[in-house]
């Protein structure tokens, strides 16, 4: 799994480098300490976080954040932990709701969300983050192709609602 992406938007990877050495920052407090700056929530996002640098007292070299961001699936896969801020806080909620009884998504999420949830959770806790998975299929058109706005083969929900009522859309 390629964890990093070379994109502008995304979760900044918390690694700073002077070209030869790397420092992994583990918390906002640690970043404030090494940079000597009081940070705001906005400072933790691009482009502001890329402006946070510091000079190493021993070598005089400047540390800058590496430009990559994390793959968006990492954020999704970290959900069981991130939603409570666990392990820094939220232990009671985490223990109460982990692992989830079930998760549900369309079948195309097998490679994305289901996998990253499982990969991160087994790496961190040694166990699956969910007990059951419910996979939904895709809604197909008259030619048995997946309906897609980009293909232009969707049925407009308001037309179905007006012609057949809300129950036809509720499933």
Regions found by a protein language model. Give the residues of each.
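Structured secondary-structure scaffolds
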Residues: 1-171
């Amino acid at each position: 799994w390629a964890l990093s992406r070379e994109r502008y938007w995304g979760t900044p990877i918390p690694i700073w480098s002077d070209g030869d050495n790397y420092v992994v920052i583990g918390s906002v407090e640690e970043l404030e300490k090494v940079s000597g700056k009081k940070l705001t929530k906005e400072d933790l996002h691009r482009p502001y976080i890329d402006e946070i640098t510091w000079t190493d007292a021993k070598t005089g070299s400047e540390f800058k954040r590496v430009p990559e961001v994390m793959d968006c699936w990492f954020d999704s896969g970290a959900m069981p932990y991130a939603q409570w801020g666990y392990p820094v806080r939220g232990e009671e909620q985490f223990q109460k709701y982990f692992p989830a009884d079930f998760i549900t998504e369309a079948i195309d999420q097998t490679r994305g969300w289901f996998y990253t949830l499982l990969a991160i959770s087994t790496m961190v806790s040694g166990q699956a983050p969910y007990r059951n998975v419910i996979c939904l299929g895709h809604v197909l058109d008259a030619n048995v192709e997946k309906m897609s706005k980009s293909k232009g083969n969707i049925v407009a929900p308001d037309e179905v609602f007006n012609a057949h009522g809300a129950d036809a859309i509720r499933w």
